[in-house]
Curated annotation (Swiss-Prot):
GO CC, one annotated term: chloroplast inner membrane
High-level lineage: Eukaryota, Viridiplantae, Streptophyta, Zygnematophyceae, Zygnematophycidae
Name of the featured protein: Protein TIC 214
Transmembrane segments: 23-43, 71-91, 96-116, 145-165, 179-199, 226-246
Record's function text: Involved in protein precursor import into chloroplasts. May be part of an intermediate translocation complex acting as a protein-conducting channel at the inner envelope.
Species this protein is from: Zygnema circumcarinatum
Pfam families on file: Ycf1
Compartment annotation: Plastid, Chloroplast inner membrane
GN (gene name): TIC214
Amino acid sequence: MITIAPMLFSVLRAYDLACINTAGPLIILGIYYGFLITLPIAPSQLVCIRAFLLEGEGKESESPGTVAKSGILIAAISGLTVSQLAFFLSIYWPPLYMIWLKPHLLTLLVLPYMFFYWSRIQEFESSGWLKTEQSKIYDPRVRAAFLDSFLFQALNPVLLPSPVMTRLMSVFLFRYSQVSLFILGTAIGWLGGQIMFVLLSWCLLLRLERDLPTIYVIVRRLVHNIFPPIVFGLCLAYMGRAPVSFFRKQTDIQQMPEIRPTELWPSVAFDTTLWKRPFRLPKKDMLDNFPPLYNNKKRFSQYLFEVCVSEGKRRLSYTYPQSLLAFQSHLEDCLDVTYVSQQTDNDIYHEWATSKQNRKDQISNILLKQMEALDNGAPIETVIENKIASLTTIEQPVRKRLDPRLAKYMRYNTLSNKTESPWIQGESSVLEDTSLELQSKPNLFHLTENNYLREWISIKSEQMINTLILPWQSLEHDSDAALLTLLNNSPETNINKEQLYTWESLLHAYKLNPKVDIYKTMPGHKKLLYYLTKQPVTKLLTQIFHMDQRVDSSDIKTLLDYYKPLPVWYAQRHFTTTDIRQPRISKRLKSFDFVRRLITGSLRARRRNTLIWNALQIKPETPFLLRVHNVSKQEDMSIKQAISVTTQQTNLYASETAKRFNFRLAHMVRSPALVIQSWFRKYVKQPILILFKNVGRLLLLQKTEWSEDIGDWAREVYIYYSYDGKQYSITERPKKWYYTGLQIRILFPFHLRPWHPSNATADGKDKINLQLQSDFDLVNNNNSILEHSSYLTVWGSETEVAFGNVKKKPSFWKPTFKAIRLVLSRKLNKQFVKIGNMFQPVYKLVQTPLSSKFVNQTMFAQEEPSVSDNMKHNTIEQPINSIDNKNLFFLNHNKDNKATKNVLSIEKSSLILSDNRASQDSLVLSSDSNKLYTNEHKLENTSKQLLVIKSEHTKPLQQPIMLFRIKPILEANTIIKHSLIGRPPMQTNQKSVDNFQVQLLSKESSISIRYKLTQFNSLLVQFQRTWIYIKQNIQNIIVELFKFIQLQFTETRMTILHLIQQLMQLVSSQVITGFRTISSGIDHLFDSYYIWRMKHFTAKHLQNVYETTPIDSSSITQAYILNKIWQSIIESTPNLSWVTQQWTSENRLQDYLQTQLVDQGILNCQEPNKLTQANWNKWLEFFPQYIPSSNIWLNVIPNRYRSEVNLYWKYCDNIDYKNKHPIVSINAHNKIQQSNGLRYHTPLLQKLEKLSKRWKMYNLYRRYTSFVNNINTNRFPTEPILSNELNQLNYVNENIVHNSVNKTEETISYREPIEWGFTRTRLGRFSPYLTLSQSHSNNSIDDIDTEDIETLGLFAILQTYKEFNKKTNFTSSSVDHKLHKQESSAAPKIDHKLDSQLVSTNLIQRTCFEPMYASKLKSKLLKERFKNLLNAARLSILATKSGVTTDTTTFLSSNMQRDLSILTEDLNTHKDINEGIEISEETKQDAYSKAMRNSVLFKQNLQNWRLKIMDDQIFMYNMVSPILRLSNREHNDYILNLCNCLLGELSSNLVESIVALTPEDILLPTSSRELRVLDCLDLTAGPNDYQSVSNNTLIQNKTNSIAVTDQILQNKSKLSYSNFVSNIQQKSKPSYIIKRFLWPTYRLEDLACMNRFWLSSGNQSRFSALRISMYPSMLE
């Protein structure tokens, strides 16, 4: 018992330690989380601290034990702990947890309580803490403290969430909610944290009371004053976060639903602008680290399960869209639609199978119709499906969205508004459409004939000015045209342009044919679309989605703003400019950043990490991949706005600049700068300008404008916009504006009023200033707000649009400059007047000689008969008016002659008095004239008066002054006579009267002379002005004439140079064409000679070996199809860029392609839009883009390859044949030896076994890829540079053929499959272009070149190539030994030729691709062991040759001795191979070395490692590596020259024949893939029939292979290839059979490829290289 007790204790101790090790981390983790919960300061902790300070009894600071005696403190702490405990326990009760996370119910209770609590704590009771009695449990203060702490803690997770508590909740929910140890540790930590909180609160109270005893009451009051604002802020924050529903005002304003294009169900229920994958959100840029703009949880739930239909089966989707489910529930309430859950599995499956079968029939019918059109003589380019849309005219260039030379991002997508005629055969005819079922085009048979009438109509329509759209041309509608058609073609009678349309009617504008009963023909899932077009259902949908809001049709831009079309790259550039100062504007597609941010807790999407950067895809595309690209059928719906070219350039420049600076770093610099600039402009810059202006006016004694400027300054408003132009607010900025960008728009921008003089006079004479001021106010009041707005820039300037040109401001000093010019001109005019007054003395000198002349004129005037008063008035009124209007300047400035003024004034007054009817008007005229005279010196600074004065000074006087007719007037009134001289007459006699008249006439003569001088000055001024004007015109004419002559000379020179260039190009092209024709003829002669020579040598040795395969052979292998695809890539589709790099003058392919490109105008195109449709069609017709048909493949079918493969496996599987050889016993012995003595080399032997497996597979597929074993291959011409090598190889082939003819069944050894194709690897450089015969050599594995074996890392042989040649005819049979003796005489010649072949063979092996051998040894230890084995092998050879035995090798190490002993034992087991054969000693040594090489160490039972399925990676490597290894220039030229020959032969023989075209090639790749997948499906089987067609195909293929194998075994004695082929052909049917022994259809990988093609996604896996074309047999 005593001895058992320690053992028992030790067991219990171990159990305890194990429990501690497992439970310890959980408990510690729980304590950690529970303790951290109490650390963050929350509102509940603040309430408890307030209870400590204000609600206690005043003795808490003495000891911690007194806290337990205070009921208020206990209630506060209890409320805190109970609330936290309830929150934790809510995890196990979901309703309580939902109440806490969605506290809408608690909102009604908590908010009023918080308001009451806030009002209650406003009062402060300073004596409350002095109470000595203990608080009872029924004390209201105790209950209030408990409720306060409880409710504030309940609000803590919602109002102020703690990250520690959130983390703890996540841990509870997802990890350790059922682990009791973790819960226990959390409880312990939580209790510890609460106790620590109480102790820390007590320490705080103690510290305050002891350190500040005098101001303790002040601290309490301060705490009381701080706490109410905190509670009130928390209350407001809670109301803003979780508002009550009845507090919010229910507005009747409904948001306008978004208009979407017409889509199918269920896509119509989705928002086309959002991501449909729930976990993928777009990211703006790489520097954007804040959360995305759209919250994905509002639109899609992470997991929503719903039943759906997929591939004819009912499935459960876990990512079913929630919006689709809600829409479906609404439809089920108002429509009688059969739901998925109500249908049976059979109905769903049959409906799906029927749709797929119909689709299959549709594509098949289209294919048959197109083939019938080809049979009727229709050209291929009109029947084959292409991606180039048909155009109306030949001269119209190809649009850039259809140009195949451009990348995809340069082409824009168009919506499905494009309607095609049945005459056009495009991709849309193959794609499935739900609104209009696809028809089989019955008229295609007739339309594909030669329709000369259609061609004649097309040619005539192109010559017309107003070209009409013909029925066989495509129709393209713009968005605005479609909407105008919808408005104009309304069925209502009383319609006007202001008619209102609902959004719902525009959304569901479907057009169906009412004559066809579509409801009966369409499937079930399409019937919903039929229901949506009916009016009652439309009304129901309007009521459901509240789509009854109306929109005005006149404002069509509002409707189109809902669409977000991509920008269009037009074919012609209308906005090109030659100004190098401006950046080149080019519209590009908006590129999106596909870097996704995953939501926390979501799963990562299963997709490959492919590189999708758009910047790396900007490359021109080759025209050879034209038919692979898909062009969408959507059209852009942008409206063509009629704006000027300058405005478009400005907008394009602004948009490009905005895109250029749309990144986060630029926003962080630009946005604060804009805000600072707006503040500086508003409060610093503009007030300073107003101050300086008015102070300057005050100093210049002008009227100030404080009120006007301040009013304009106050009108200026700043509006904050987001970076994309969305208006946000006037007072607030957008959220995170410093990250996302900001724009500031200014309404009514402030500008200083122009400087103008004030209204100093009170009579209101400054009318111009008032008019200018009124015009300025009128402009400010009448212009709209948008016209009076601008955008603020960082530098403080203003622009019309964001990032646009700087807006021009009104000039402040412009009126001032005008006034200065006016004053200067007035001063100059006064100076000219003074100069005119200097000529007054000249007038006095001529007064006396002219007195007699004036007297005679006066007497003559008295003798004239009197006239009536009216005639006097009429004759005198005109001179007076002329004086008033024409001579104002002269009369006004003649200050010396005052008498003249009085005479004129009295004269005018007498004339006015004589006519009573015009008295008033004349007085007004006189007053106006006097005013003009008096105000002449007070001219104002107005532009109108300035122009008048200038014209008066410079314009000549046209009418003379009639002063000589004054005498009749003087006789009529004597008073007027006395008044004319200014005084009464002193004498009344006749003499005094005559003197008076003489004086008067002398004054009149002086006036007339002065007038003539003035007229002369005016004429002089006019002449000067006229001369200046004529001189300027002559200069302008000379300049324009010189420019015109220079321009004409330049154009003429350019035209001549262009003509010379074209002439030189024409001459050079003709010369080059002639030389090319001559050179091509010479090359053709050489090629024909070498072709004849090759045929002669090959036919000479092959006529007794095989017979040619008949044309009606019906077996096609998949391996050969893959090979022909690989071959067609090299032959017919070279890379255009690579061809241009390897361009040489000796190249036939260059001449062949360049001539066509130059003739068609493609090579010399400077811009892509110059490529016309006709040229492109010719280019497509010329280039051989096709896959050879099965009829052509029959001529080159490798039947010998299949037969040899069958023979290979037959002998490998022949048990009787294996039993005849001692290799079985050798293997058994080797296994024993390996288990005993070779255990040290076990890893190396395992590596050797893997290498042997790989080597055997390499032999098999290398026989195929080398292509030297196909005797039926068409012979293609080769180049002269290879003649020497071909002659040498021909000799080798003769020997091989000679050996193969004398070959019998007994000579076939078990080693032959291993050596198969080994000696032909040197000829791989010429495959598959050379035609070399198939042969079976007698050589064993010993005859293989050691370099090839050494590449696999098996062993190294030290023999030379000459020693190897001596053993070429050595065999293991006596018959072969005799043949060797007979041919020994011819050995020197053969050796000489083989020696000459050594150099060329080595050169060929250098350039040939290396085989795919095994990887290096994994460790250095294996490498050292491998070296030891090689050393042992060499020592064994040396010991055998020198006669040294194993006993004398004592100087070697123990390991090497052991290796030599094992080699000796292994070689002794092979001695029975050569028994019974008499050979020389040298031959024995060679046999010994061969036997050593065949030992178990280097060839571990190769026959037992058979693999009948090739490795796809190795196969693909050997298919592609010959193309990749052609790196040197010689091989490139060689392949290019071969392409010339092949291209010439194919283009001359095969392109013109329809048989050369595969029927499947008529369809597009998408349609052909869909047809292949549909053809593989068994749509007639039931839903429960799980026996697929692939299994039947597998059984059938196995049966066929077994039958063929039996046939080979039965004809074992007849091994000739011709007999074998003839037997197979007799039993074969004329139908075509595709045997898939490499990649059959029942393989799982093949089905995976089908699924990828079915989803129309890019397949980048390895299986895409092994896909082959399936097509029906067309020739029977």
